[in-house]
């Protein structure tokens, strides 16, 4: 059984790496990577990139504080520092194995603060539901406001959805189909995991307590503030990078929101930090807003790479910090 599970895990990781790598290869085939060095050293405004870093750190910090708040009503009280470091670790570990971070952060709380694993996992489910609903709400509002932009684009270029589909290359159809299949596979595994948890009474109770914990949140305005703060910081972490490049510095906040939302949806596809699907989705939307294909390729490659490096550094910091953190008595 363990061997079968190990093989399945290896296949999942291999599949995610293959998918992300295939999309990146298709996007950057024939791309002159020698120009990236020139852009990084001479054409990129590093001041704006550095200014975006605090917002990336704050987004994860707010997530850690919010998580602690959802655990308090169910009798679990992790330390704020451990909660935040668990978030830093979870994002870094998800670069190695997609989605593993959600389980890893629960493991960190159990190991250092004796927090019940099933209960903490239940609150993770709660958080995901809330974040998904918020993203969908923002997406709906943004796209309704941007309908004139899309119509104007089609009018100026003399195109329609029908003509776009006709111009869609065979490779484009393949990539889109692969992304769709990947989402279905992810849903399959999530449902399969859920069915396994349902067979374990203690875990089911923990999950339910985690979901129900939202009702007992003592400071609802603070919880809402953390939630909005998380996504505002994520957006600023992304949007400020527009100012790093001359080609994107003129783009509006609304354009930033559209590309940000599309990118956030694209990372649902299980690849390390959304590598591949995120590049494809954001690059496509930037082209829609008038950015050349080459400039869009530079933007998504550099921004994603640097922000991924930040995630790695935060993970290393968390690992070092936890190494010097005393462990509380564990709960069974």
PLM feature spans:
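Predominantly cytoplasmic-facing regulatory/coupling regions of multi-pass membrane proteins
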Residues: 1-88, 145, 150-267, 306-332
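Transmembrane alpha-helix interface/packing and boundary motifs in multi-pass membrane proteins
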Residues: 89-98, 258-279
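Membrane-embedded alpha-helical segments of transport systems
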Residues: 92-97, 121-144, 298-313
